[in-house]
A protein has these predicted regions:
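Extreme N-terminal leader/targeting segments of oxidoreductases
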Residues: 1-25, 40-44
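Conserved mid-domain beta->alpha element of the FAD-binding
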Residues: 29-39, 45, 140, 190, ...
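Glycine-rich FAD pyrophosphate-binding loop
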Residues: 42-63
Length: 576
């Protein structure tokens, strides 16, 4: 029987087939999202067992960019320096090139300096960092393993599971020994990818487009890509030919590892019959020595799950949103899921989370997933809509004119949204949210390429430096934090008492008026994930009601409207 068709596990089966283990959270999937969740839970003192059918090695990295927001999480976990020092050359140019091939005709480039001298945002203490999955995953794995709360079990496959009401029972098999074991957990979280078996077993459907285009990645080693043309060195070279965009070459490690991506492969594409060497030669525009290390066929998708949970089982990462890699939102969106769910699971397990706190996970994260999935598709549509210019590679005047025309098209500021997207990275907000107190102020525009810091409830609490090397966001994480921006300390005994009664962790921090203009209120309550829950000039009359709402304890469920994913072929943006 298939994994989906197998009967639900009974306690009797579990006892017969192997040993039983108990934990608070069972995590299925050991990619970056599953590992991030294990770290987030461990950081909060929650015990977890992570199972993954693979060996934990990353032969073919799918991601190589860690966003500023993910770096902020890494900062809280204590590993941001390790990510920065993982190995990416600090003097490597942050450059995007558009050309007929790596060594062919170039018609446009974006230069943004290097990791050490590029223009940095004032909106965050951390910044985007190139760190391929071959470095990032092992870094997360080792950090997770150091936590006494965490158990990582590779070569271990979830065979079946059952939500029995008070807990989840998962039967797993050790693929090396063939032995079965039962893991009992208060909750289970599936971080098992776009083809999530757990999502299928739960019967949760997806909305969107399952096949925007068929793609292939060719991974290769080459130390001579830019030999003799160092001025062309780039993190990515978009390949544009007579029929438009046909692929891109990107650096994986800033040295000798590369990925060639090719788009719009035929539906019957067979990677085994594919001439990868010819494709690499065409992309490089020169016959240089290189070694193919892998070929990976994949489908570009635009999907969001209709539900993010069922009972005691939750879904994170690609299991609930599959998006085009353009813009680098995939893994980073998944890690945001893990952080949002992580503090809510911890609150529930520690006894202070209300009945509706875990339901707010889907209500907050699904709109962000729809937003990011659609933006990734839109950005890819923008690039793929570059016109087909037949003479683009010609050496005559017609070719020169065609390349000039393409260069003029690429001057459109919208093409920068692929890598200039701080609004997407930092500007996502939980508005509306049942556990954030709404206010009548006008929300800031939700731009892609620019970001205006705001402390409006639901938003990420703004960054500001308190002292050398210490950001205001370094105050957030363990529990709720009440920021007091008044000249003299405000009396907030009612809120402190209410939080103590409900066993909600709360710290009051007197900042003073220096950053009140940024937060636009005298008092601001920040959640454990660093998002604003409430703000005001004084405490509300009923402090207990405020505490109950932000911990998800209401008289009845609060309905939240969730947008639908754009369920159609991607928009073709006219830029001609």
């Amino acid at each position: 029987m298939s994994e989906i068709d197998q009967p639900a596990l009974t306690s009797y089966q579990g006892e017969l087939r192997g040993q039983r283990h108990r934990t608070q959270v069972l995590i299925v999937g050991g990619g970056p999202v599953g590992l991030a969740l294990s770290i987030e839970l461990g950081w909060r003192g929650i015990h977890s067992i992570l199972v993954d059918r693979r060996d934990g090695l990353i032969p073919l990295p799918k991601m190589n960019g860690v966003s500023a927001r993910t770096m902020e999480f890494c900062r809280r976990w204590g590993i941001s320096d390790a990510v920065r020092d993982a190995g990416w050359p600090q003097d490597y140019p942050v450059r995007m090139v558009y050309a007929t091939s790596v060594r062919g005709h170039e018609f446009f480039r974006y230069d943004r300096g290097t990791a050490t001298n590029r223009l940095q945002s004032n909106n965050t203490p951390e910044h985007f960092q190139r760190c391929p999955q071959t470095w990032f995953d092992p870094l997360l794995r080792e950090h997770s393993k150091r936590m006494s709360t965490n158990t990582l079990r590779y070569h271990t496959k979830l065979e079946r599971f059952k939500d029995v009401g008070a807990q989840v029972e998962g039967e797993v098999i050790d693929l090396l020994s063939g032995t079965y074991q039962t893991i009992e957990a208060d909750f289970m979280v599936a971080c098992d990818g776009g083809k999530s078996g757990v999502r299928s077993q739960l019967g949760i459907a997806t909305d969107g487009n399952a096949l925007l285009s068929r793609e292939v990645n060719v991974y290769f080693e080459c130390s001579d890509v830019y030999a003799g043309c160092e001025e062309r060195r780039a993190v990515m070279t978009w390949l544009v030919g007579c029929s438009g965009v046909w692929g891109a070459v990107s650096s994986i490690d800033g040295r000798a590892l590369w990925r060639l991506w090719l788009t719009n492969m035929p539906e019957d594409f067979d990677a085994e019959d594919f001439d990868a060497r010819r494709a690499v030669c065409d992309a490089l525009g020169a016959d240089v020595d290189f070694k193919i290390t892998g070929v990976l066929a994949w489908d570009r998708q635009q999907l969001v799950a209709r539900k993010f949970s069922k009972g005691r089982v939750f879904l994170c990462g690609d299991a609930v949103h599959s998006l085009t890699p353009t813009g680098g939102f995939g893994m980073n969106t998944g890690i945001q899921d893990a952080v949002d769910l992580g503090w809510k699971l911890a609150a529930s397990l520690n006894g202070w989370g209300g009945a509706y706190l875990l339901e707010s996970y889907e209500q907050e994260r699904r709109p962000v997933a729809v937003r990011n999935v659609d933006e990734a598709t839109h950005t890819f549509s923008l690039i793929s809509s570059l016109p087909a210019l037949e003479c683009l590679s010609d050496e005559d005047q017609l070719g020169l004119d065609a390349r000039r025309k393409m260069g003029e098209i690429l001057k459109n500021e919208q093409f920068k949204r692929e890598f200039q997207n701080e609004g997407i990275v930092l500007g996502y907000r939980y508005d509306p949210s049942p556990i954030c107190i709404p206010e009548s102020s006008v929300p800031a525009p939700d731009f892609v390429m620019s970001y205006h810091q705001t402390a409006r409830p639901g938003s990420r609490a703004p960054h500001a430096w308190l002292s050398e090397g210490r950001s205001i966001i370094d105050l957030f994480g363990r529990g709720f934090v009440l920021l007091d921006f008044a000249q003299s300390k405000t009396t907030v005994d009612a809120l402190v008492s209410a939080a103590k009664t409900r066993k909600v962790p709360l710290e009051v921090v007197h900042i003073g008026p220096s950053h009140q203009d940024l937060y636009e209120a005298r008092l601001v309550l920040v959640r454990p994930d660093g998002h604003v829950a409430w703000r005001g000039e004084s405490l509300p009359g009923d402090a207990m009601k405020l505490i109950d709402q932000v911990r998800g304890a209401f008289d009845q469920q609060i309905a939240i409207s969730v947008p639908e994913v754009y369920n159609a072929p991607p928009l073709k943006v006219s830029i001609r």
